[in-house]
Amino acid sequence: MRGYLFGILSAVFWALSGLLYNELPLSEYTALGKVISLLFLIDFCSLLVIGITLWRKSAVDFQGVFWQPALSGILGGPIGMSAYLLSIHYLTIYYAAPLSSLFPVFAALMSYWILKEKITKTAQFGFALAIISSSLLAIEVGQEITFNTIGFIFLIICILGWSSEIVISSYTMRSLSGLQVYFLRLCGSTIGYLLILFILSLKNFSLDILSFNYVQIAGVIIFGALSYCCYYQAIYLLKPIKAMALNITYSVWAIGLGYLLYKQPIKPITLLLTLLLSAGVIVTLYYKGEQK
C-alpha cells in the first residue's frame, strides 16, 4: 500500500512543481542558465536531506556501487530534467507534461529486455491504453498553442533520458534500497549540473534565479525534490512498471490542478481522455505478471 501512495504523491508533487515552473518569467536567452541553476538547487538540497537521513539510519554502506546510479542521475537529471523544463518553457506544461509521460514505453521495453521483467497480456493492454490516452491528451491539449520544433526535440531528449534512468536505477535496487540509490543518483546529477553551470558561466549565460518570486522558487524546489524521493521509493516497493504507471498520471494532475489554481479550462474530450488514462493505469496496477 505504501508503494502506491508514494507513486501517487510523486505524480501530484511533479505536477505542482511543473505548474509553478510554468509561471516563472523566463525569456528565451535566460531560460537555459536559470533552468540549470534551479535544477542544481533542487538536487543539491535533496542530496543534503537524503544524505543526513541515511547517515542517521546508519545506511551509508553502498556495497561498492556508485557509477551505475550516478550515471542514471546524469541521464535523468542534467539531460532528462533539463530537457523537460526547457520543453515546458517552449510548449507550456499543458503540452509538455502529457507528451513526456510517453517515457514509460521505452523504459518498459528496456525493462523487458534488460531486467527480464514479465508483462502479462492484460498488463500490456492497460499500459498501452494509458500511453495512447496520454498521447491523445497531449495532442488535444496542444491544439491551442503553436507547436515548437525546439520544444519537441527537448521532449525526445527528455523521454530517452528518463527511460534510461529508470532502468539503470531499477537494476541497482537489486542490491541497494530506494533511498540509497536516490542518494547516489543525486551525487551524479549534482556533479553534472555543476559542470554545466561552469560551462554556461564561461559563455556569459545568466544564472541568477533570485529575480524570481521566492515562494515560486521554493515551491518548484520542494515539490520537485519530494516528487523524486517518492518516485524512487515507489520504484523500490512496486518495481518500475507499476511505479511508472502511477507516476505518469502527473499529466492528469497538471491539467486538474491547472484548472483549480490557474483557471485553465478543461474540455469534455480532455476529461474523457483523462478517464481512459486512469483506466489504463488501474488495469496495469492489478496485473499478476510482477510480484511486489
UniProtKB/Swiss-Prot annotation:
Residues 70-139, 160-286 form the EamA domain. One of its GO terms (cellular component) is membrane. Pfam families: EamA. Keywords: Repeat. Lipopolysaccharide (LPS) is a glycolipid that is a necessary component and antigenic determinant of the outer membrane and has been shown to be an important factor in the host-parasite interaction in a number of Gram-negative species. This is Protein LicB. It comes from Haemophilus influenzae (strain ATCC 51907 / DSM 11121 / KW20 / Rd). The lineage of its organism: Bacteria, Pseudomonadati, Pseudomonadota, Gammaproteobacteria, Pasteurellales.
